């Protein structure tokens, strides 16, 4: 079995994590929002997408690990996908600060 890390459990990351979990992978999902983590751990959908409401794994589901800590998750993962927001700035350029922060956190958590 392979372990997949998903950094960012929003409208892209959460369904991606669920899809990999349903395919048999162990999931290490990470989000900076404690509220999001608490909801996903409770089997609830924090995204607002009604298509996800009935597919979030229930509490205690095997191979489903959800945390706010990238440092906790990454050492368990064979691959890490970053699915964080890239909002548009006032001058219509992508704000990559979330991607950069997630990338740094993943890099720092990789076992040396």
Language model region names:
Residues 1-112:
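Structural/interface elements that position substrates and couple domains in central-metabolism enzymes
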């Amino acid at each position: 079995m392979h372990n997949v890390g998903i950094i960012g459990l929003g409208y892209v990351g959460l369904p991606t994590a669920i899809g990999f979990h349903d395919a048999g992978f162990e999931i290490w999902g990470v989000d900076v929002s404690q509220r999001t983590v608490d909801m996903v751990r409770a089997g609830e959908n924090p995204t607002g997408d009604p298509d996800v409401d009935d597919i979030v794994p229930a509490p205690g589901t095997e191979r489903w690990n959800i945390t706010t800590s990238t440092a906790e998750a990454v050492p368990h993962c064979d691959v890490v996908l970053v699915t964080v927001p890239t909002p548009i700035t006032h001058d219509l350029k992508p704000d990559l600060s979330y991607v950069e922060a997630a990338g740094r956190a993943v890099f720092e958590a990789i076992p040396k």
